[in-house]
Curated annotation (Swiss-Prot):
Protein name per Swiss-Prot or TrEMBL: Beta-mannosyltransferase 4
Pfam families in UniProt: BMT
A single GO cellular-component term on record: membrane
InterPro entries documented for this protein: BMT1 (IPR021988)
Compartment(s): Membrane
Transmembrane helix in keyword set: yes
Topological domain ranges for the Extracellular compartment: 46-503
Cytoplasmic side: 1-24
Organism: Komagataella phaffii (strain GS115 / ATCC 20864)
Transmembrane segments: 25-45
UniProt-listed GO biological process terms: cell wall organization
Gene designation: BMT4
Length: 503
């Protein structure tokens, strides 16, 4: 039977399927212009869960499933600050507040043994084996391994959440001094049940098929004897090419610790090194916050500096970046401050006529405040572009979503009286509206707790809160005022003092 264009589009947009061994089915024509095939590879050790006769889909659920809608949501007070051109104003004069709602966290699990076993079959084997391990039992060996910093993005063509996490191998070193890091890639259905033994073929080359879960095949420079490999991996996707995600990370090379991008579903030219045009590379580049500007399918933007707002625009082909926007005097030294990169930025789920709006969760790093030498917490930031001008339309005080954060030293404790106390939002996987409008928005975020626990939770109410903000003043006078950062810094210190009193 000959299919017309509409029928072909319908078939290609259908979700992926579990298939019986040695069967394959054309399932998805991606935006890259190549066709993806889904295969399930037979294994003598594992059973395939579904049969081709039933063609059971991976999921019949949309990204907002009934489970997401009917989950228990708990209120969280959201307070923060909007811009002002008056440095003499009191912080309370421009401090809107509201209520958002979040679910309990859902912890994502992975097997350290499976991770180690898979790495021993790769080109990285020599990086993860020390001689003393020949006489060690497997339980003691696995104490040298950690997973952390899970980051997720929803891939519409796969109808699944694609999650990347950092894997650290310490060797005989301490937890803060790993020998090497890798990027683990997992696949989850809309309700975050892991999907295993899914093989995805995206080219006919020898390395053109991946089987989930797997280790991202990053080209790792062998520079030095520790801190090798990709660190702080984040995943993001351009809404205009929604099935072509990019993994962003920093990695040491022969020159510096630089920022890289990696496209896992491209048949070639997967890895790109980012550099700023006409500038000498800094010794250490990290914490770049990715986002995408409408109408720019061949570029990725980064918030390069959150204190002195600096925006980069980078080619995804060459990796060359230009400074698209710098607030204030480019030569002015604002200092590092407490603000660090966290999640990706995602666009507001409905469009504005005169501006572009993004939302994300950077993090604060507060030293010797409250209860710990170093406290990290996420905060909500709204970034706006009007014409060529960018500004922060809202910066919240720190958020913890009602979580008693796990102790840095013990899984059995939530004590904050330790060297570090860490909660960070690593990604916004999706942010979608039901037909009812802004009152029914659902956001999925991934969290990292104590740098050992990866989890996800759902958040409601951010769309309505952002829509109610005053974002009409794109005046360039706002670019020279640090008042919003000063007030957010004060609010952050007040938060950690209160948290310390309770923990």
């Amino acid at each position: 039977m000959k299919l017309d264009t509409q029928q072909i589009s319908h078939l290609l947009s259908r979700q992926m399927y579990h298939l019986a061994p040695r069967k394959k089915l054309l399932i998805w024509g991606g935006s890259l212009g190549f066709v993806l095939l889904l295969l399930i590879v037979a294994s003598s050790h594992q059973r395939i869960r579904s049969t081709i006769l039933h063609r059971t889909p991976i999921s019949t659920l949309p990204v907002i499933s009934q489970e997401v809608i009917t989950a228990d949501y708990h209120p969280t007070l959201l307070t923060g600050f909007i811009p002002t051109d008056s440095d003499d104003s009191d912080c309370a004069d421009f401090s809107p507040s509201g209520v958002i709602y979040s679910t309990d966290k859902l912890v994502l699990h992975d097997s350290l043994k499976d991770i180690r076993d898979s790495l021993l079959k790769t080109q990285y084997k020599d990086l993860v084996t020390l001689e003393d391990e020949e006489k060690m039992n497997i339980d003691d060996i696995l104490k040298r391994w950690y997973t952390l910093s899970g980051s997720s993005v929803w891939i519409p063509g796969m109808k699944a959440h694609l999650v990347v996490s950092r894997v650290m191998y310490l060797g005989t070193n301490g937890r803060s001094d790993p020998l090497v890091s890798f990027v683990r890639v997992q696949l989850f259905d809309p309700d975050f049940n892991e999907l295993k033994d899914i093989a995805l073929k995206f080219s006919d080359k020898p390395d053109g098929t991946v089987i989930f879960p797997y280790i991202l095949p990053v080209d790792i420079p062998r520079e030095g004897s520790r801190w090798l490999g990709p660190e702080d991996a984040k995943i993001a996707v351009n809404p205009e090419t929604p099935d072509d995600p990019i993994v962003i990370f920093n990695m040491q090379n022969s020159v510096n610790r630089a920022m890289y991008g990696f496209y896992p579903f491209r048949p070639e030219n997967k890895q790109v090194l980012f550099s700023i045009k006409d500038e000498e590379p800094r010794k250490k580049e990290k914490n770049w916050t990715p986002f995408f500007v409408p109408g720019s399918p061949t570029t990725v933007n980064f918030v390069y500096d959150l204190q002195k707002l600096t925006i980069l625009k980078c080619s995804i082909i060459t990796g060359i970046c230009e400074k698209e926007f710098v607030s204030g005097d480019d030569g002015q030294n604002h200092g590092i401050g407490i603000f660090r990169g966290g999640s990706n930025l995602v666009p507001f789920p409905t469009s504005f006529t005169d501006k572009d709006v993004w939302v994300g969760f950077p993090k604060t790093h507060m030293e010797s405040c409250g209860c710990s030498s170093h406290i990290y917490r996420p905060y909500l930031m709204v970034l706006v572009r009007k014409g060529d001008f960018y500004y922060k339309a809202f910066v919240s005080t720190p958020l913890d979503f009602g979580i008693d954060v796990r102790s840095w030293e013990s899984a059995e404790s939530t004590s904050c009286q330790t060297a570090k106390n860490v909660l960070a939002v690593n990604s916004i996987s999706n942010w979608d509206l039901l037909d009812d409008g802004l009152d029914k928005d659902y956001m999925t975020i991934t969290l990292s707790e104590a740098d050992v626990v990866n989890s996800v939770l759902r958040v409601r109410g951010i769309a309505k809160f952002v829509d109610n903000l005053t974002m009409d003043d794109g005046s360039t006078t706002l670019s020279t005022s640090n008042k919003i950062d000063e007030c957010a810094t004060t609010g952050s210190k007040q938060y950690c003092q209160r948290y310390g009193e309770l923990h």
